A protein has these predicted regions:
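Conserved class I S-adenosyl-L-methionine
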Residues: 1-54, 57, 61, 151-181
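Class I SAM-dependent methyltransferase SAM/SAH-binding core
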Residues: 57-107
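Acceptor-substrate binding/catalytic loop of class I
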Residues: 129, 190-204
């Protein structure tokens, strides 16, 4: 199943680079993630690992902020895309990207204990680990390579948003497929109906995975919030500056509300390595 995920992203690197700028909902995921990272990270330069960082959207942003960043990903396609994109970045970003490496989040043996001041694991990397033992391994590895007291930022794909979207778009054939009920009953999706293999989380399940493996959850955020899965509707509002400004204000107020977190497309956990 790991190979299926790798193969998917090997052929999806171009789309992944543009995914967060393609529509207003993706943009919400991007700006909200960046906001909460910058809320907790110091302004001084620190060393960051961006594991599962794809073609480098967040890694380049962190490098532009002055941090020293290692970008790592399982997908060869994403790594090649990141390397090509880096050539077109500013001198500041180029100098602060320390390495672009191929790595599996369940085994970060190439880095010593406490090698990084902070770690990013964004975009649903943990969701692509179907075996719970692998998810535990991944959290333990994130904890191990991050310094004590350092912040770890992890986002996953929410289960309720996936189920609501299926109903909203009237995906009748997918709803009748056994995979739909597997998602409902907490089992994993094998990727046979599109996208790729995935485990979709409830907020409390995600929180438990983190806390049970030694991380202190400081804050949880619904990255797309009230706009989750409403791409067409959000686009209609996006064209009106005043209306969209009010949507952003509502998002800022409610993105950490427990109900909004649990129904968001992506859920971000801000964790401290206790």
């Amino acid at each position: 199943m790991r190979e299926r995920v790798k193969k998917y992203y090997d052929g999806f690197s171009e789309e992944e680079w543009g995914r967060l700028l393609r529509d207003p909902v993706g943009e919400l995921e991007l700006i909200t993630t960046k906001k909460f990272i910058k809320k907790y990270l110091p302004k001084r330069s620190i060393c960051i690992l961006d594991i599962g960082g794809g073609p480098g959207r967040y890694a380049f942003d962190m490098a532009n902020s002055g941090h020293k960043v290692i970008l790592a990903d399982l997908s060869t396609g994403n790594i090649r895309k990141a390397q090509n994109l880096l050539k077109r970045q500013s001198k500041r970003i180029k100098s602060n990207i320390q390495e672009i490496a191929e790595a599996d989040i369940t085994n970060l043996k190439m880095w010593r204990d406490g090698a990084f001041d902070s770690t990013l694991c964004l975009g649903g990397v943990i969701s692509h680990l179907l075996d719970k033992k692998d998810r535990v391994l991944a959290i333990k590895e994130l904890k191990r390579v991050t310094k004590k007291g350092g912040y770890i930022f992890i986002s996953i794909i929410g289960r309720l948003a996936v189920l609501k979207q299926e109903i909203y778009v009237k995906a009748l054939e997918e709803i009748k497929d056994p995979n739909f009920m597997k998602v409902v009953t907490e089992e994993d999706y094998d990727g046979s109906l599109g996208f790729t293999a995935c485990h979709f989380f409830l907020k409390d399940e995600f929180n438990g995975l983190l806390e049970e493996n030694g991380l202190k959850v400081v804050e949880m955020v619904g990255l797309e919030g009230l706009n989750s899965f409403l791409k067409k509707e959000s686009m209609a509002v996006y064209g009106d500056k005043k209306a969209w400004a009010n949507i952003l204000k509502a998002h800022e107020i409610y993105c950490t509300h427990p109900s909004v977190v649990d129904t968001s497309d992506h859920i971000l956990a801000v964790c401290k390595n206790a």
